Amino acid sequence: MQRTVNIQAVESKLKFTFSQPRLLVTALTHPSYRNEFPSDGEDSERLEFLGDAVLGLVVTEHLFLLFPSLNEGLLSTTRSALVNAEACFNYTQKLSLGEHLLIGRGEKMQSHRGKISAYANLFEAILGAVYLDGGLAPARQIIVPLLPNKEAILPLMLVNPKNRLQQFTQQTLKVLPTYIALPWSSEDGTPGYHVQVFVNEKLWGEGFAGSKKEAEKLAAKQALSTHDDNKN
């Protein structure tokens, strides 16, 4: 059975009124819902693509202005922590937008991972819709209040071993670590990555994992464990 969208309720949560409400309906339409009701307009995928870029720009600008002396590497990794799927899921939860998602009956949302993905995509799609309807300013007004304050962002930078290693090598050696990723397979044949981290062309650590990002974290963690006396 097709569901209707309470446009005013969503607009109230966003504190933004659409001049083109159809954009909001599209943003709320998960691809699985459109598969069940193909005559019911577009799904949210294209708006997700646009919203991802809008979110990245606003967060980049916010960090750039908030931390005028922070280098590009730390700005980049901090931005990643504020725009990843987990972060977007949390933004959706803060605004209580998930209840408005139009999703197909057969779509798996029982798992936490499935819910994170669906809600993260929803947030990006809504940002894309807001941007098309009103431009960057209203999108910024939605995003910035959801971001952690400066004091909360500072420790966030050091939670990731890559950030801690970068800070350590910059402070002590005035250089940045370099990561090299190689294909790797686990004992059961699952593909993944073997990442090596070098500092001044010397191998400092290695990591093995299914994703390159996780392998980089493990390599950085090993490098810290053998080179940073203050790691604890």
Swiss-Prot record:
Give all residue intervals belonging to the RNase III domain: 7-135
- Identify the residues that bind Mg(2+): 48, 121, 124
Which InterPro entries does the annotation name?
Answer: dsRBD_dom, RNase_III, RNase_III_dom, RNase_III_sf
Just give the chief location class: cytoplasm
Cofactor field: Mg(2+)
Q: Name one Pfam family in it.
A: Ribonucleas_3_3
Question: What family does the Swiss-Prot or TrEMBL record give for this protein?
Answer: Belongs to the ribonuclease III family.
> Main role?
Digests double-stranded RNA. Involved in the processing of primary rRNA transcript to yield the immediate precursors to the large and small rRNAs (23S and 16S). Processes some mRNAs, and tRNAs when they are encoded in the rRNA operon. Processes pre-crRNA and tracrRNA of type II CRISPR loci if present in the organism.
What name does UniProt use for this protein? Ribonuclease 3
Q: What is the lineage of its organism?
A: Bacteria, Pseudomonadati, Chlamydiota, Chlamydiia, Chlamydiales
